[in-house]
Amino acid sequence: MFASGVRLAQSRSFTGTKNRRWKRESHVQKSGRANAIAACLARAYPQLKVPLQHRNTFELLIAVILSAQCTDEAVNRVTPELFRRHPYPQSLAQASTAEIEQLIRILGLFRSKAKSLKECARQLVEDFGGKVPATMGELIRLAGVGRKTANVILGHAFNIPGIIVDTHCKRLSQRLGLTQEQDPTKIEADLSCLLPPKEWTGFSHRLIIHGRRVCYARKPACDKCVLSDLCPSSTAGS
């Protein structure tokens, strides 16, 4: 018990030292650390691929809208039949809400998502000639689309950099001491200031992967984390 108490005290002392050191970081130092984190993540996860199954930008947009508060695996179970029946915005816009609900019924929030899909498809047809727009301002006008979804589309369909702030990106960027903000838009702004645009999409996507595989919401696996030396929240070696 005494030894355990010593280890706990040492752990708290070490973590406190790290926190004090990184709280005194200048913007330049924090930016350097953020870029080092990006490099570590790129080595750990060299291949970037959206796990949502899609064949074109329209299908990616619909799949990302459906992925809110759902697993990618669940979305991938419903989209093949959805896209078989409605491969284009014109078809989806003409479908009944009841039919769309039935096709995506296994997903959370399926009723509200069905309404969003139908309205989004209508907007694509009437406002954008059936094409998915390629600007943030136009994308967030679409039903069911916020900045997170828009940045996924911009980054992966149009190669336009953007920070994708989901629950994993938010949690990890806070644990890494890269932001103290709670609002996703402010987190996006903080991270954007620390990294060059060419890193934005890959960095945030890899943070999401790392959050799913290592840096869990509860009991993060710090001892097998490639970022432990760069993270003020790490308990590795304690």
Regions found by a protein language model. Name each.
Residues 22, 27-238:
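Catalytic cores of DNA base-excision repair glycosylases
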